[in-house]
C-alpha cells in the first residue's frame, strides 16, 4: 500500500515537471516559445490599442475645455455670503479681558488684510462701473484696488488696531463668494438684522454698499490679483458689562439678479452667525 502511494506521488511530481518544461516538445507551461511570443504580441497590441484610444478620447475632451473657466457653471448661479474672522459653526466668542485670545483674532485680521489688500499690480477704477469692455481678449485681467480706509474703524489703521474687540464693539467682515462671470445688477448692498433690540449696527462702506467696479470676476488663473470687496459691520451692544449673546443674519439686497432666500441653501445670499461677548 505504501509503495503504491510512493509511485502515485512520484508520477504526480513527474507530470508537474513535464508541464513546467517538456524537453521532448520544448514546451514551457504547455506552450512553445513561438506560441508564447504570439500571445504576448497579441496582448501588447491589444492593450496598446486600448491605451491609445483612451489617450485620444481624453485629448479630444480636453480640447473642449477652457483652461481658465469651468465649462459647466449652472449649479452655482448665485453667490453665498461668508464672514471673517472664520470660526467653527459660525460662532465668534471672545473675552475683552482675555488678551491671548484677542491676539489670535488680531493676528487673523492682520494676516487677512496683508494678503488680500496689497496694492501691488492693482489699479484705481471708476466707482460704480463694471470693467468689462476693456477686459475682452486680455490674458491677465485688471484688478481694482480696494480702499482699506473705507472700512472706517474696522480697517485696523492707526487708532483702531484692535478692530473694536478690546471695548466690546467688534467688527465682522462680510463678503460675497466669488462666481466666475457674475455681474450684479442694481445697487447691491449688505444689511444685517438681529432679534436683539439692544444693539447698534454700523456699516462700512456706508450702507454696506458693494461697488460694481469689482465685477465681473474672471477666475483665479486669469484674475490673478483680484481683490474681493468687503463690507465691515461694527456691532455695539447697549450693555457694556456682562455677557452678550447676539445672533445676526446678514443678507444681500439691491440686486434683482441675485437671490437671498432659498430654503434648500441657507448660505445663498445670506449668512447667519452668533456673537458672544464676555467681560
Curated annotation (Swiss-Prot):
Query: Quick one: where is this thing mainly located?
Result: membrane
The residue spans the entry assigns to the Extracellular side of the membrane are as follows 57-279
For this protein, the record's InterPro entries field holds: Na/K_ATPase_sub_beta, Na/K_ATPase_sub_beta_sf
Q: Which GO terms describe its cellular component?
A: sodium:potassium-exchanging ATPase complex
**Tissue-by-tissue expression:** Abundantly in brain, eye and testis, at a lower extent in spleen.
Q: Which residues lie on this side of the membrane: Cytoplasmic?
A: 1-35
> Which pairs are disulfide-linked?
125-144, 154-171, 192-250
Topological relation to the membrane, as annotated: Single-pass type II membrane protein
- Kindly list the GO molecular function terms attached to this UniProt entry: ATPase activator activity
Provide this UniProt record's keywords sorted from A to Z: Cell membrane, Disulfide bond, Glycoprotein, Ion transport, Membrane, Potassium, Potassium transport, Signal-anchor, Sodium, Sodium transport, Sodium/potassium transport, Transmembrane, Transmembrane helix, Transport
TM helices/strands, residue ranges: 36-56
Cite the Pfam families for this sequence: Na_K-ATPase
Q: Where in the cell is it found?
A: Cell membrane
Report the glycosylation sites. 147, 191, 198, 239
**Gene Ontology biological-process entries:** intracellular potassium ion homeostasis; intracellular sodium ion homeostasis; potassium ion import across plasma membrane; sodium ion export across plasma membrane
Q: Which family does it belong to?
A: Belongs to the X(+)/potassium ATPases subunit beta family.
Subunit info here reads:
The sodium/potassium-transporting ATPase is composed of a catalytic alpha subunit, an auxiliary non-catalytic beta subunit and an additional regulatory subunit.
Q: What does this protein do?
A: This is the non-catalytic component of the active enzyme, which catalyzes the hydrolysis of ATP coupled with the exchange of Na(+) and K(+) ions across the plasma membrane. The exact function of this glycoprotein is not known. Some specific sequence of the beta subunit can modulate the activation of the Na,K-pump by extracellular potassium ions.
Q: What is this protein called?
A: Sodium/potassium-transporting ATPase subunit beta-3
User: Which species is listed as the source?
Assistant: Rhinella marina (Cane toad)
